[in-house]
């Protein structure tokens, strides 16, 4: 066999592996400085300063300032109130701050600005709320450890000089990917995972998962905790909460049903992990921060947005169907999830109302009422584990639809149990 034939055989035999490695790992971890300039001063946190060394990355990061609806009609980067399309939110979160202000998220550069403007923030709000809102969090944690979590939020605004930006995901000293959220590191350690030994591909999801995840505040210290000890599924996290970890039992008491409720927070990482992309080793950044080329230079886009805004770069590196077909496929999945999500949310809202009416009946069976409250607590948790996500279920459609179906079933059980308690039909 000639040398040329041997070379061709090697290329054919290993081509897929080489291609995937090139597409997904080529440039994201160690960005090259502009025109070979020296690296910035170690410890620099200002994205504008770092942007002078990485102009293409910074230019794309600036696109996160744009506000526009999603190409699929779901999500988007305009901070419109969700209750305008989902009025059931006002019932389901009655008695807690999300009934006052629950909007779609704008881009990362707005993180501090939107936190300050949120109607959920009051003079009593604590520093734990800053954990995923500033690039300064690793410095704050280094100086104060978890003590910052119980500080007044207003004080931390003085130390949080930059919104979510470079230093949340890159070590300012080495520019390598790193996780800055201590809650994520602690959760992974409890799961037996050493983040310091993570692969490049894993890190490209970990830097996103450190904030796009469910969490709660430890009652005494206000430390941020991720409820992953039993797993990432809604059922597993619910079982974890049932054990009242660190004394945590509930986020609030619903004023209608008197159920002890939980509020889910953007569990995107958990949902992605069990989906086809997560199980296939496709990282968050592969789709949401694709590799681009400009003036002959490859760089990673830092416009963290829907892959449907740049289908060619985000999707067609793996998928060979046309852009229109891919967009319609995503729309179809999201439409199915949206319809079932609305049914679940409205059924949960009705359950709260029925339990409240049943409890007002003088001779209502208290034991049955408690069963109904537990059912609506769990039904709403399952609904919220989908409703609180970004992506309208696309990260794991099978799991999401199953979760919503179970939510609807439990909400109907809650209604039936409440009616049984009151020996009537509301």
Kindly label every feature range from the protein language model.
Residues 122-140, 145:
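A cross-kingdom signal targeting lumenal/periplasmic-facing segments of multi-pass membrane
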Residues 104-126, 158:
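Long, charge-dense tracts
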Residues 1-2:
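N-terminal secretory signal peptides that target proteins for export/translocation
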Residues 417-426:
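Long amphipathic alpha-helical segments
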Residues 5-25:
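Hydrophobic membrane-insertion alpha-helices, especially the h-region
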Residues 23-106, 142-286, 290-418:
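Primarily the internal scaffold of c-type cytochrome electron-transfer domains
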